[in-house]
């Protein structure tokens, strides 16, 4: 059997699966779609994160594929229905990066509150020492709205309560006792937008949530409210968010995701994904690093190893 690894994952995966099969790691991580199609023909196990998209073309090229191990949570980049039709089992790692993503959410919320990034630039680039230019606000006493109150959303709320924040949340799929257990008030999206000082998004990207955060929902928010997005870029309409930031209709937007994310060396317009948000003040972005901790990588790696071994009956 053959295993192909196409992204940076826990070294333990190659080490353990190498006891049962030939394991190869692509030179370019992740490869392009065409490169993957050219090299996947005799592969039994594919280990990946989110790039490239595994669509019908890729799956048709994968004549021997039996298992796809996804070292992340979302599966919107994989045609899971067609994979199932072809008998390919797909495993992801729900919940195992939850604490890492939650901590990054709090990190960005603190940064937006205390303006540490522009303050750093002002000192190191402009060579100024103006502490009065960066007056912030405390999290204590503020309201945090959580859109999507699953494992990650609940963990964010748990940490935020330590700062003295009030938690309100939207999740139509959860029973009332979950909100009560987590000391959160259940509200509609409109209500969350209206009362929150900070709103954090932890939803999957699907037809129901795409462009969920748009001009209408932004208009319902406080003018100094901050939006945090550690989920998927397509949930936030970037054009509407950019216009709101430039018009002063929102306090800030901090995200770990973009509507168009591509692999490559640098953020250039030629790369095909330059967002209008890049020209906005009060905007902070990171390159989808929510799960990028050694701790999460270790836990996810162990989970994927077990799933692959179970699927292929490897003892």
Residue ranges and their predicted role:
Residues 43, 62, 195-196, 224:
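An anion/phosphate-binding loop that grips the pyrophosphate of nucleotide cofactors and donors
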Residues 86-88, 94-143, 158, 162:
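Phosphate-binding beta-alpha-beta segment of Rossmann-like dinucleotide-binding domains, i.e.
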Residues 26-29, 71-72, 88-99, 171, ...:
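Short beta->alpha connector loops at strand-helix junctions that form conserved
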Residues 19, 132-223:
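Rossmann-like dinucleotide/phosphate-binding beta-alpha-beta segment
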């Amino acid at each position: 059997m053959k295993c192909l690894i196409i992204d940076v994952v826990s070294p333990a995966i190659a080490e353990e699966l190498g006891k049962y099969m030939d394991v190869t790691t692509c030179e370019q991580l992740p490869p392009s779609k065409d490169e993957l199609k050219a090299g996947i023909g005799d592969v039994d196990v594919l280990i990946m994160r989110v790039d490239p998209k595994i669509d019908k073309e890729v799956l048709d090229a994968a004549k021997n594929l039996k298992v796809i191990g996804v070292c992340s949570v979302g599966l919107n980049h994989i045609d899971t229905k067609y994979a199932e039709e072809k008998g390919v089992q797909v495993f992801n790692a729900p919940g195992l990066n939850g604490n890492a993503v939650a901590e990054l959410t709090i990190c960005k919320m603190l940064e937006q509150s205390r303006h540490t990034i522009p303050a750093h630039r002002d000192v190191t680039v402009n060579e100024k020492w103006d502490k009065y230019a960066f007056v912030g606000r405390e999290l204590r006493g503020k309201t945090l709205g959580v859109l999507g109150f699953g494992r990650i959303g609940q963990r964010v709320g748990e940490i935020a309560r330590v700062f003295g924040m009030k938690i309100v949340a939207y999740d139509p799929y959860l029973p009332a006792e979950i909100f009560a257990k987590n000391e959160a008030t259940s509200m509609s999206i409109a209500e969350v937008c209206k009362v929150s000082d900070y709103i954090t998004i932890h939803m999957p990207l699907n037809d129901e949530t795409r462009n969920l955060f748009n001009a209408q929902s932004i208009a319902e928010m406080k003018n100094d409210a901050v939006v945090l997005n550690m989920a998927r870029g397509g949930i936030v309409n970037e054009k509407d968010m950019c216009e709101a930031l430039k018009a002063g209709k929102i306090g800030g937007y901090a995200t770990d995701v973009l509507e168009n994310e591509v692999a490559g060396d640098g953020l250039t317009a030629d790369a095909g994904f330059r967002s209008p948000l890049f020209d906005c003040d009060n905007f902070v972005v990171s390159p989808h690093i929510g799960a990028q901790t050694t701790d999460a990588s270790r836990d996810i790696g162990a989970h994927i190893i077990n799933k692959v071994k179970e699927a292929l009956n490897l003892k």
